[in-house]
Amino acid sequence: MPTIDAWVRFGRLLSSDSLTAGSPENPVMALPRAVGTVVEDLAYRFSSTFSRETVAGYVAQSYRLLSQRTRVREHLLTMTARYAADRLDALATAQGLVLRDTPEVLFVCVQNAGRSQMAGAFLRHFAGGRVHVRTAGSAPSDTAHPRVAAALSEVGVELWGEFPKPLTDEVVRAADYVITMGCGDSCPIFPGRRYMEWDLADPLELDDVGLRAVRDEVRSRVLDLLQELGIEAQEASR
């Protein structure tokens, strides 16, 4: 996989007149014309922070990362826009270009389809916007698992359109807490972050009873994390 610098150089090509141009690292890289709309929208959104070329490079790489894993293509452009925007937002945070007054928490598991999605959903639910939550996978699946979504829904927590995302450096650099679940060796280590490993079974390998047990354990750990952050959980009685 080309480096992000290579993709930024590719972004310069996207910023000219072609969405089918190549680069030394990707001589026949072709992107749908509609990706240009994503570039334009995000270039405007991040115009005070990043060059159009940088935005285009991140959009191109994000599209490629997702397209390699996503079987359902219907929402690929929407997912690309969300994924690229989140990565650019993380990059701005990591580089100190924006100031945050909320903790940044990153949950990482292997597929980003089970444990990390559960943890992210619970933390969003209980924190109520007082924590910035991201999730990622070291070898992400193509979709969040329906059994996980159903188990969360049983306790009043929703995934709200979340999807598996490949782990990238900038989201780790942006985090205050990096919590891994079965993939700690795959997560880059940067100074100044608190790294935690939650030893949890992969719910996708369990029956429904086992999956619910993991769900409840994740819930308990998220509530403990909120206590550590000094944030009172909302609706913790559920």
Q: What feature does the model see in each segment?
A:
Residues 2-25, 34-37, 41, 50-51, ...:
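Basic, alpha-helical nucleic-acid-binding regions used in initiation and control of genome expression
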Residues 26-28, 44, 187-238:
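Phosphate-binding/catalytic loops
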Residues 113, 183-186:
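Short glycine-rich anion-binding loops that position phosphate/pyrophosphate groups of nucleotides
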Residues 172-173:
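A short, aliphatic-rich alpha-helical micro-motif
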